[in-house]
Amino acid sequence: MHIGIYINNENISSVDCKNLLAGNPGIGGTEYCVLLLAQVYKMYYSNNKVTLFVAKQGILPEVDNYVVVNGIDDLPAKAQKEDVDVLVVSAVYNGIPL
């Protein structure tokens, strides 16, 4: 199974999010939970592929792949190109509910 997880990390790309098990590094609750999901899912289901779709390259948790997308409108095409089976998207984008 290939899981894709999207996060708009534009405002937190400079924050070290490599080890979220140590706690929230001050990135906000939703962002923390989304990135923690990617990290923990990969830890427990190491045979599954995890791709993080992000707005900016950053200091991110260890997963199989990172794909930079140009906004949420770019996400479906990139996810399809990466052959993602399940795509997780936060219900909030730039502070606005989807």
Functional labels for PLM-detected ranges:
Residues 1-54, 82:
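N-terminal subdomain of nucleotide-sugar transferases
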Residues 40, 53-98:
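Extended catalytic core of nucleotide-activated donor transferases of GT-like folds
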